[in-house]
Amino acid sequence: GSEIGAHILSGAVMDPKALTELFPNWKELGAPLDTEVSQDQFLFLTKDSSFQVPNWMLPHCFKNEGNYIVSLANVTRWLGQQAENLGVEIFPGFPAAEILYNDTGAVCGVITGSMGLDKEGNPTDQFQLGMELRGKYTLFAEGSRGHLGKQLIAKFALDKDADPQSYGIGIKELWEVEPSKSKPGLVVHTAGWPLESDTYGGSFLYHLGDNKVAVGLVVGLSYKNPYLSPFEEFQRYKLHPKIRETFEGGKRIAYGARALTAGGLNSLPKMVFPGGALIGCDAGFLNASRIKGSHAAIKTGMLAAEAAVAAINENRSADELTTYPSAFQNSWLHTELNQARNFKPWMSKGLYLGTLMVGLEQKLLSGNVPWTVHLKHADHECLEPAAQHKPIDYPKPDGKITFDRLSSVFISNTNHAENQPVHLTLKNDSVPVDINLKTYAGPEQRYCPAGVYEYVETDGKPRLQINS
């Protein structure tokens, strides 16, 4: 992004544990953790009704006492200011485009993306060549499915001993609601409708200050029905009587979507390789049972940084920071993720069995169980042919509570020059039409929450158009 926080979607519940370790006096320093969670609600939804789970029945992972509802964009900006105050140089607006390797094959830095290229990749009069940024160690913190992180995992086979990774798409809106409906500190999580019981996912409402409410839906990408549209599921979620009442009379002010890495501890790849390490969601440290990853990103960043500093003080470079994974093994974060290791595998077996087993493990046994449940399949292997399913009839947007993709993207704080290079490219041009469209009815035109993928006809033949 053009500035720190530009790519962060506001509205998150943050566990301050790692931040307190990093800056014990964060309150005095003015960290923007302003709205402490005051109340938790967990609802099971059917199409027209809801059931609130009594708080005494909720597992600890669903409780948020001591946590804060924050604008994560503001938190990252504040962290950036603290880093710069300590002498750290930050280069916003310069994406890392390529990995640099030395003669032995170890990572030795990155190359930033070249600026001022046209749609065909040719230099314009605004051209600026990317820069080489070299270091003794490089830590990759791109977030979920980072494009360099994926390359590193493949090159060094970092995931060869891990379970298949599992992902979700999280779609979120920020609303300004009527003052009478604002309840700062209230956290609401829901399960059930609008998703089918065999589709992993859940929803949330976070009441921030200043009459702001963040609302979102997470859909696991292991769903079976290729006609499912996470965007449309989110829009109709807001039509539920229990949810709609919060937003009637309000105004939507921001929209966005992000990938989530949700496989958990058993899907974590090896975190280190010659010359660097993966941290945060680039590795997959999200605790899916808590829907929280920011505290894990801070903690793993600290552990990797401590390992790198120790190595440099020993005049080392470009080797493996083995003290980072060992420090993680001995950390409270490993304990937390270990207790939640079965959450995603259980929930992948359906809402009812998953809820029963998660309740047993997390509420009755506090996550301390002798067994481990493993994910067996990658998400894409779960998608079934369109012939086995019926198209889903989603309600038309009303422009008040529900909206279309185009108007949503307009308020997503994303923009690009029409003549800039397409940043999404296909490995095999024949796959979209010959497989995706023919067998699965073109699911990419539905799963993308920004309408990037579109099937159009050219000379009477369908082709996939990428609008990016």
Spans of model-derived segments:
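Short FAD-binding loop at a beta-strand-to-alpha-helix junction that anchors the flavin cofactor
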Residues: 209-211, 270-289, 446-454
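Predominantly flavin-linked oxidoreductase catalytic cores and closely associated redox partners
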Residues: 73-78, 82-246, 284-285, 300-303, ...
